[in-house]
Amino acid sequence: MSPTIQFFLAAAVFMLIHISVMAVCARAFGITVRSISYGVGPTLLTRGTIHVKLFPVAGNVVLKDTREETLYDDDPCLDAYNFQPLWKQVLLPLSGVAALLALSLGIMGTPGWHSFIAAFGQIIDGALAPLSVAQQLLGEGETFARTHGFALVFALFALKLCAFNLLPFAGLNGGQALLAIARAGRPFAAWEATLAKWMLLPGLAMMLAWAAALAVYCWRALGL
């Protein structure tokens, strides 16, 4: 199996597990799930609250949340995410990553733990040097995919994405958990929207840097 196909499948499996675990945990916690989206882009299939989209590389779980929607005055909001105890507000966004981390470490063992710890520095270093450090890291990833089976490739890929999702930026699981801690379990805070916007910028910059690095790597690989 080519590295490209392996990484594409790994991304799809990661997304499926990540989103599913968060949705299951939300319902187990008694939180109303408004919608579950697997993938991005045009919707291919809708079944109840579940939406399957064209590109299986991301997804999201939309929860009942008074910060995002207007509810009836007589609604006690006991099933709203932001009215849950602090531990639920922190644990829920981390649940998908925790499940994937446990699965990946189970596949790779001790070397997987070292890969996970190293991923934080690699993500930052690669974003700061997309034409050098990132190219080297992408090359190492391709070499690993060419010399190992899909299970190990998925585990390594998942460990790197788990590390990325734990970074303290808005829109990522780590940022969501951090904002919940900063609110100290309160349903909302006046400063939260402003802080979230500032927390979003470095995450976007990092993603754009890695997207550019990947584009350059593919361009060079094709000999263009």
Describe the residue ranges of each PLM region.
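Transmembrane alpha-helix boundary/anchor motif
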Residues: 15-20, 24, 105, 162, ...
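Membrane-embedded alpha-helical bundles that constitute the cytochrome b-like, heme-associated redox core
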Residues: 167, 178-180, 213-216, 224
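Small-residue-rich helix-interface/hinge motifs
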Residues: 3-73, 167-170, 176, 180-181
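Membrane-embedded alpha-helical segments that form the functional core of polytopic membrane enzymes
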Residues: 2-17, 148-162
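Alpha-helical structural motif
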Residues: 86, 173-174
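Functional transmembrane alpha-helices
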Residues: 73-160, 184-210, 214, 221-222
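Perimembrane helix-loop junctions in membrane proteins
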Residues: 26, 30-34, 111-115, 172, ...
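Transmembrane alpha-helix interface/packing and boundary motifs in multi-pass membrane proteins
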Residues: 158-172
